[in-house]
């Protein structure tokens, strides 16, 4: 404590004139501590938010660029329509599509799906670079 604080009857034990901070009581000290912690947490949160926004913008740019490629666009439309068809089928039937079907039907369906997926992969690999704008 400074010499003036020793003689000041109103000075609190938390007063410290050397660093310019005067705390009249523990409540003010706690409030300042909380403000500092909240400012620090806010700065960290802002940093994370800015990084998230930056990564989201980069992702959106890549998506926009990729969707200009007709191969990617056709794949997106094809795959999303298949997913919608399957979800609609399961929702309407409340059971598996192939439940109770003969093994030959299950195998033919599986082979057909695998064949279409393979064909899609081959066609995509062949034509992707032709339309790539990167």
Curated annotation (Swiss-Prot):
UniProt-annotated location(s): Mitochondrion outer membrane
Coiled coil: none
Topology with respect to the bilayer: Multi-pass membrane protein
Name of this chain's protein: Mitochondrial outer membrane protein OM14
An example Gene Ontology molecular-function term: nascent polypeptide-associated complex binding
Keywords: Membrane, Mitochondrion, Mitochondrion outer membrane, Phosphoprotein, Transmembrane, Transmembrane helix
Membrane-spanning residues: 71-87, 105-123
Positions of region (Disordered): 1-23
InterPro entries the record matches: OM14 (IPR039454), OM14_C (IPR039453)
Entry-linked Pfam families: OM14_C (PF17304)
GO CC annotations on file: mitochondrial inner-outer membrane contact site; mitochondrial outer membrane; mitochondrion
General remark: Present with 4750 molecules/cell in log phase SD medium.
Example GO biological process: protein targeting to mitochondrion
Sites of Phosphoserine modification: 12, 15
């Amino acid at each position: 404590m400074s010499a003036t604080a020793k003689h000041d009857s109103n000075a609190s034990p938390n007063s410290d004139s050397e660093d310019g901070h005067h705390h009249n009581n523990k409540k003010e000290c706690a409030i300042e501590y909380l403000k500092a912690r909240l400012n620090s947490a806010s700065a960290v949160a802002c940093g994370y938010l800015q990084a998230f926004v930056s990564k989201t913008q980069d992702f959106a740019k890549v998506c926009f660029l990729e969707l200009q490629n007709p191969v990617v666009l056709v794949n997106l439309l094809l795959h999303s329509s298949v997913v919608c068809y399957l979800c609609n089928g399961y929702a309407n039937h409340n059971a598996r599509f192939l439940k109770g079907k003969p093994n030959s039907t299950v195998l033919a369906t599986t082979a057909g799906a695998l064949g279409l997926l393979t064909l899609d992969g081959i066609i995509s690999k062949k034509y992707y670079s032709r339309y790539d704008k990167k």
